[in-house]
Every structure is written in C-alpha cells, then in structure tokens.
Amino acid sequence: MHRARWLTPVIPALWEAEAGRSRGQEIETILANKKQSAMPWDQDPEQSTGNYSEDEQNGKQKWREEGEAGRKREREKEEKNEKELQDEQENKRKRENEKQKQYPEKRLVSKSLMHTLWAKFKLNRCPTIQESLSLSFEFDMTHKQISQWFCKTRKKYNKEMSKRKHKKKHMRWRSLCCQGWSRTPALK
C-alpha cells in the first residue's frame, strides 16, 4: 500500500507504523487521540470552567458583580437627575407665580378706556412723562405698565406698517410687470 508522498501522515509515529516498525499499543492510542477532539463539539471553550483557574473564575464573578453595581449606580444617577429636573421645574413655576402676584401683567380695563388709550397712541406714539402719568392715574395703572403698553403697541404697529409697506411695493411692482413694464430694456 503505497501512498503518494504528499499524502503521507505528518505524525512521526505514523511514519514508523507505515514503514513497518509498529509499536503496538502506542500507535493505537495516537490514532485514537487523533480521532478524538480535545473537547466535545457541544461544549464552547469560552464557557468551559475547566480551562480557567479559580482566581480567573472569581475575577469573572467580581466583574459581573461590579457590572450589576455599576448598573445600580447608573440607575441611581438617572433617578437623581430626574428628581433635580423636577425640582428645577417646580422652582421655576413658583418663581413665575410669585412674579405674577407681584406684577400682574394684564388688568381688565373697560373698552371705552382702551379706545381712549388707543386714540392717545394714534395721536402720539411716544407720550411724555406727564402724559403717561396722567394716563396711569386715569387707567388706575402704574407708570411702568403704561410705558410697557405703549412700547408693545409701538412694536406691533411698526411691524404691521412695515408688512403693509412691503406688500404695497411688491404689489406695485407686480402690477407694473403684468402690464409689460420691466426694469431691463427689451432686446430686439
């Protein structure tokens, strides 16, 4: 039984066996060991406890315990952060309520007084101090509230006027374009 050279076994004991110098039991054990795998196929070497010393196994247990403790600490931190956020929100609400109690933003004013105030605004958008003091007495408001109302109304009014102005310019330009007018001379 001659095999090609490239098919010859790599184990020296097998070379001797093929050459006719058998050692009996030794070869059978070598072949038996060669056929058996070092570990059964269903056993994962990473999960095997036999490969690790007790110190390594204890280290894994400590690592697992540290992982659980770490998760616990993370949960505690998250709960603490959530609690802090809730406290901040409650404090913010309390501060806003206190501000509203100190300085009520809106007071109910009759429509006729509001029309009067609006008429004063149309006549003079920036009242003098004497005018604003007389208005504050008339409307039973503070000087600060009157000046704030004028400031807010002025902002709204100016914004509305700029929108209208822009619309007028845009509409004027569109109407000119629709009639055939353009800014660039027509090329013929």
Swiss-Prot record:
Protein name from the UniProt record: NANOG neighbor homeobox
GO terms for biological process, alphabetical: regulation of transcription by RNA polymerase II
Highest taxon, organism lineage: Eukaryota
Protein's UniProt keywords contain Cell inner membrane: no
Keyword field: DNA-binding, Homeobox, Nucleus
Compositional bias ranges of the Basic and acidic residues kind: 57-106
Annotated Gene3D superfamilies: Homeodomain-like (1.10.10.60)
Chief subcellular location: nucleus
